[in-house]
Amino acid sequence: MTNRRGFVGLAIAALGATLPVGAAAPAGTAAGKPATAKPPVQRARLPRRLASDFRGHIETRLPLLRAPFENAAKDTGIGWRLLAALGYQESRWRPAAVSPRGAQGVMMLMPQTARKMGVSNVFSPDENILGGARYLLYMKERVPQRIRDPDRTWLAIAAYNIGIGHLEDARIVTQMRKKNPDRWADVRANLPRLSDSRWHSRTKHGYANGAETAQFVERVSQFAAILESVPEQGATGS
C-alpha cells in the first residue's frame, strides 16, 4: 500500500538476479534490455497456494488490466511486468479493492497520493495504474542518483510501500551497522530493525514494520519473474 504513513512517507530466482524486462535501465545500458546483477540474497519459493493463485489470475484477471499496465509502462519507462507484479502484490489485481487504511484500487493509492499523481477516479484501472506507476517513478527519483539498478528499483519499491522517510531510516541503520546503504540486500536485512526500539528510537521517523516491507519487495520480485514467461502482445510461442 502506498504512502501508509504520509506522503514523505520493485521468480523464483534470487532477488535482483534480473531486472524485469523494460524497467528503466541504468546509464550505459540499452533501453528495454534487462539489467543484471548477482543475486544479493537467497530466498524461498512462493508458497504453493500463492503461486497457484497467481498463475490462475494471470489467465483470468491480467488480460483485463494488461493494456493499462502497458500504457503506464510507456508513460514512465518502467517495465509493465514490474508494474503488474506491484499491482498484484497490492490488490491481487482487483480494481475495486479498498484497504482498511483507505488505500484504493489496483495500485492501492492513498487519496492524497492519488491526487498528487493526477488521479481523479481512483477506481479506474487506467488512471489508478498510471498513478501508481508515476508514484513509483517519483520514489525512484528520490533514491540517490548514484545508486544504480537493480538496487535502485528495489529500494524505490520499498519506498512505495513504507514511505521514503522510513526507507532513509533503514538506510541509516544499515550504515550504522557498517553495511552498504546503497545495496538493496543490505538494506533489506536491516529493515526489520525499524520495529526494534533499540534502533527506531535513533531514527527520524520512528517505528515501522520493516519486515513487512522486506517481504513486500520480495513478493513483487517473485511475481515479476513469473511474469517474464508471459509473451509480448502478438508474440508467438509459449
How would you name each of these model-derived features?
Residues 21-33:
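Signal peptide processing junction and immediate N-terminal pro/mature segment
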